[in-house]
Amino acid sequence: MANRKLFIKSYGCQMNVYDAGRMADVMAPLGYDLVSEADGADLVILNTCHIREKAAEKVFSDLGRLRPFKEAMAAEGRRMLVAVAGCVAQAEGAELMARAKIVDMVVGPQAYHRLPEMVAKVERGAGRVLDTDFPIEPKFDFLPAPQAHGPSAFLSVQEGCDKFCTFCVVPYTRGAEYSRPVADVLREAALLAEGGVREITLLGQNVNAYHGEAPDGRTWGLGRLARALAEIPGVARLRYTTSHPRDVDDDLIAAHREVAALTPFIHLPVQSGSDRILAAMNRGHDVEGYRRIIDRLRAARDDMAFSSDFIVGFPGESERDFQATLALIDEVRFIQAYSFKYSPRPGTPAAALSAQLPEAEKSARLIALQARLVEIQQAFNQACVGRPMDVLLDRPGRHAGQLVGRSPWMQPVHLEAPAALLGTLAPVVVETATSNSLAARLVEGNSSMSSDRVLAEEAPPPARIRA
């Protein structure tokens, strides 16, 4: 009997990408193979995001597109099962079931290890399934060993959030902060490395709030965990996301100084450059505190660069508040960023605020902010020209003889290289740059080049920040 087909579409964050991979791992023993198209799939999973209204509404649009596929399969005597997973499922599960009859299963982000049971229940005619309970025992205890798919992999070490920013649904959809035990993380990382993974990105809603229990009963923070992961044979690079400024501690900063595998690039969301707006968001820090963290991290590694999240048009944001955000962007010189118009999320405190801004004003501010960010990104990329760096080659390029990889700062790098180098860290020198990527040539030498610690001097320098 031929294996069944599984199609998964993920929306939103890297955690959803990780979760999608683990769903595939859960279903693989039942004979489900991943496919790239929903048409003809036996099981379709929409792994959803609830951060913004647009992302949530897109789920219903995609469900409408699935209907003809499901009906066509039914006409052939076959059955397509449709599951909605992720944060929309958690927040709006009952509404999904009522509004979209095409949906067979609604699966919360802490329940997808039970997918095989849900599928079996639907297949035996026991009705549709809604499972959005937060389990007493962590889902990780029930997941199979991870499968390596290429030289880079995500590894979830922390989930949930206790911060309760006024704009955010994550505490309600992902639950309280939970850190996986140290031994489990190290075991999973070792399995990935044995499968050829060279770069591991540690994931968490607040990943640097990690406080996992070690075998001796002590609690490890993210810095100590990074040191242990770097000792695993084969692990050449470590990244982590998403971090919160409140959880950047002394040991994590020291780890960036001491652990060569930790890349000099941190996603550290600030959301706004205005103290007034940060307080309204309940972020738990002010702009000066954020500056001090940036300054300390740059003191640990002088090639450190940053990305961030920005929300424009938060309720009550004045033009002065917005200009303060632009000033912080100019000061820190973020080389990447995710930026959005404020989107009220039902049930969050900010949604009830009266000073909501007009959409036109939010749009104009977003355009201005993104233009400023693009200028900085272009300058950073251009300043990399002529510089040596190590690139993790992770996929073939568009042209014959071309490979594509990632720089330490996450820029895509294109170069001519033999296919045998796929999956390795290769020493290169950057020859040209665009706003989005770099082109480089392969050079002779050891792939563990220290040149990853070079920050392009020709770029407009990041402002030194007051201690």
UniProtKB/Swiss-Prot annotation:
<feature type="binding site">
    <location>
        <position position="161"/>
    </location>
    <ligand>
        <name>[4Fe-4S] cluster 2</name>
    </ligand>
</feature>
<dbReference type="InterPro" id="IPR013848">
    <property type="entry name" value="Methylthiotransferase_N"/>
</dbReference>
<keyword id="KW-0004">4Fe-4S</keyword>
<comment type="function">
    <text>Catalyzes the methylthiolation of N6-(dimethylallyl)adenosine (i(6)A), leading to the formation of 2-methylthio-N6-(dimethylallyl)adenosine (ms(2)i(6)A) at position 37 in tRNAs that read codons beginning with uridine.</text>
</comment>
<feature type="domain" description="TRAM">
    <location>
        <begin position="382"/>
        <end position="444"/>
    </location>
</feature>
<comment type="subunit">
    <text>Monomer.</text>
</comment>
<keyword id="KW-0949">S-adenosyl-L-methionine</keyword>
<protein>
    <recommendedName>
        <fullName>tRNA-2-methylthio-N(6)-dimethylallyladenosine synthase</fullName>
        <ecNumber>2.8.4.3</ecNumber>
    </recommendedName>
</protein>
<feature type="binding site">
    <location>
        <position position="165"/>
    </location>
    <ligand>
        <name>[4Fe-4S] cluster 2</name>
    </ligand>
</feature>
<feature type="domain" description="Radical SAM core">
    <location>
        <begin position="147"/>
        <end position="379"/>
    </location>
</feature>
<keyword id="KW-0408">Iron</keyword>
<feature type="domain" description="MTTase N-terminal">
    <location>
        <begin position="4"/>
        <end position="124"/>
    </location>
</feature>
<dbReference type="GO" id="GO:0035597">
    <property type="term" value="F:N6-isopentenyladenosine methylthiotransferase activity"/>
</dbReference>
<dbReference type="GO" id="GO:0005829">
    <property type="term" value="C:cytosol"/>
</dbReference>
<feature type="binding site">
    <location>
        <position position="87"/>
    </location>
    <ligand>
        <name>[4Fe-4S] cluster 1</name>
    </ligand>
</feature>
<dbReference type="InterPro" id="IPR006638">
    <property type="entry name" value="Elp3/MiaA/NifB-like_rSAM"/>
</dbReference>
<dbReference type="InterPro" id="IPR006463">
    <property type="entry name" value="MiaB_methiolase"/>
</dbReference>
<dbReference type="GO" id="GO:0046872">
    <property type="term" value="F:metal ion binding"/>
</dbReference>
<dbReference type="GO" id="GO:0051539">
    <property type="term" value="F:4 iron, 4 sulfur cluster binding"/>
</dbReference>
<dbReference type="Pfam" id="PF00919">
    <property type="entry name" value="UPF0004"/>
</dbReference>
<feature type="binding site">
    <location>
        <position position="168"/>
    </location>
    <ligand>
        <name>[4Fe-4S] cluster 2</name>
    </ligand>
</feature>
<keyword id="KW-0411">Iron-sulfur</keyword>
<dbReference type="InterPro" id="IPR007197">
    <property type="entry name" value="rSAM"/>
</dbReference>
<keyword id="KW-0808">Transferase</keyword>
<dbReference type="InterPro" id="IPR023404">
    <property type="entry name" value="rSAM_horseshoe"/>
</dbReference>
<dbReference type="Pfam" id="PF04055">
    <property type="entry name" value="Radical_SAM"/>
</dbReference>
<dbReference type="InterPro" id="IPR020612">
    <property type="entry name" value="Methylthiotransferase_CS"/>
</dbReference>
<feature type="binding site">
    <location>
        <position position="13"/>
    </location>
    <ligand>
        <name>[4Fe-4S] cluster 1</name>
    </ligand>
</feature>
<comment type="similarity">
    <text>Belongs to the methylthiotransferase family. MiaB subfamily.</text>
</comment>
<dbReference type="InterPro" id="IPR038135">
    <property type="entry name" value="Methylthiotransferase_N_sf"/>
</dbReference>
<keyword id="KW-0963">Cytoplasm</keyword>
<keyword id="KW-0819">tRNA processing</keyword>
<keyword id="KW-0479">Metal-binding</keyword>
<feature type="binding site">
    <location>
        <position position="49"/>
    </location>
    <ligand>
        <name>[4Fe-4S] cluster 1</name>
    </ligand>
</feature>
<dbReference type="InterPro" id="IPR005839">
    <property type="entry name" value="Methylthiotransferase"/>
</dbReference>
<dbReference type="InterPro" id="IPR002792">
    <property type="entry name" value="TRAM_dom"/>
</dbReference>
